[in-house]
A protein has these predicted regions:
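N-terminal membrane topogenic signal
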Residues: 2-19
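Transmembrane helix boundary and interhelical junction motifs in multipass membrane proteins
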Residues: 166-171, 248-253, 263-265, 282, ...
């Protein structure tokens, strides 16, 4: 009798394979997109590729260690991680490396390090720890600073990042915990208040910082400013459009020849579309969707609420960055400087993304261990139910 064969042995292997495929695609694209910029600035066409490979090696080691690490230990060191993150972000403002008017990096001699990337995952960890505890103990979820200092810490961290300035990353740092709070059961009233205050702050920032208002105007009508603020968006759209269905061929795109700024970082996807075409872009899109799908599967079956919320946050991080970057390069949203996970050049971003995936695997692995250890035991644990929907509404079940 024939037995049904599974394409994937398990979800962890599926996630690992998808991540490796995306990394291979990203490495090839970085090699092609960065050649001209690297040769022009450093007289070495493989300058960025070599640094990317070094980061990739560090990322592989970090991924392997993190996937075996017991994620539950993160709850005990969340305060330490928060303090280290704030100290690093403070150091950036004092002695950080300035590039294109933004001070976002710390120099380690042989490489540069971007603390705001760590801030993304740290805010997810501390938020997941608080939310998991609230769900376990059936405590009402709130963002009131008198009852919950965690959300305030996320705001402080986002404020440090915004001061660099880096609005795109700051929005991610505060946006993802907000969605996590909503998933865990924060009332719609609080969500509305957060969104309202956020809108007012964004309006004030755009009003008092003219370059941001110019960026919004250039996004609204980039073609009338094609030689000014709208130049980058126009060149990105032209690059994507010129790729057609099958692309110009790997290495044959012309936008990387100093036409498209940041062609190997924030706008690497535009170069990829030009050289590989719609077909390649669609494959990357499907891979990211598949990655999110398997992460959601793990979140749904995870019994530990801290692990569940941690996987939710990491999934939101990957999906949010991918959506923001793709929308940015085709002109749907203003330029916000958000990288495409595993595709855009960025050593710290790559390492932290691999660590994030390692944490997802850690959650699934350790919950499988618990499941196996209790397989032959009779457990009568009632499902989570809340008496008041206004206080508790655990939306992810």
């Amino acid at each position: 009798m024939l037995t049904k064969q599974k394409f994937w042995i398990n979800d962890m292997e599926a996630i690992t394979c998808i991540m490796f495929i995306l990394i291979v695609i990203g490495t090839i694209n970085i090699c092609s997109a960065s050649l001209i910029t690297a040769y022009t600035n450093f007289e070495n066409p493989y300058f960025f590729l070599i640094r990317h490979l070094i980061s990739l090696l560090i990322g592989f080691v970090a991924f392997a260690l993190t996937s075996r690490f017991n994620y539950k230990k993160l709850k005990n060191c969340s305060l330490m991680l928060t303090v280290i993150t704030i100290l690093c972000l403070s150091a950036v403002l004092l002695v950080g490396v300035t590039v294109n008017g933004s001070r976002r990096w710390l120099s380690l001699g042989f490489m540069q390090f971007q603390p705001s990337e760590i801030a993304k995952i740290v805010t997810i960890i501390i938020s997941a720890s608080y939310l998991g505890q609230c769900i376990d103990k059936k405590i009402p979820i709130t963002v009131n600073p008198q009852k919950n200092i965690i959300f305030l810490l996320c705001l402080i961290i986002a404020g440090f990042v915004e001061a660099q300035p880096d609005m795109g990353t700051a929005l991610i740092i505060i946006g993802i915990p907000t969605i996590m709070y909503f998933i865990a059961g924060l009332s719609k009233k609080w969500i509305g208040i957060i969104c309202g205050i956020g809108f007012i702050l964004l309006t004030l920032l755009a009003t008092f910082q003219p370059y941001r208002l110019d960026r919004i105007n250039s996004w609204y009508d980039p073609w009338s400013r094609s030689q000014e603020d709208g130049y980058q968006i126009v060149q990105s759209i032209l690059a994507i459009g010129s790729g057609g269905f099958s692309g110009m061929g790997l290495g044959h795109g012309f936008s990387k020849y100093s036409y498209l700024p940041e062609s190997h970082t924030d706008f690497a996807f535009a170069v990829f579309c030009q050289e590989i075409g719609f077909m390649g872009a669609f494959i990357v899109f499907l891979l990211l969707i598949a990655l999110a799908f398997y992460c959601i599967k793990i979140a749904l079956r995870t019994k530990d609420n801290f692990g569940k919320m941690l996987v939710c946050g990491i999934t939101l991080l990957i999906v949010g960055q991918a959506t923001g970057n793709m929308a940015m390069v085709i002109g749907i949203v203003p330029v916000v400087g958000v990288p495409l996970p595993f595709i855009s050049y960025g050593g710290t971003s790559l390492i932290l993304n691999m660590i994030s995936i390692g944490l997802v695997l850690s959650v699934d692995r350790h919950n499988h261990i618990i499941k196996k250890s209790t397989k032959n035991e009779t457990i009568t644990t009632p499902p989570i139910k809340y008496l008041s929907k206004k206080k508790h509404l655990y939306r992810l079940k």
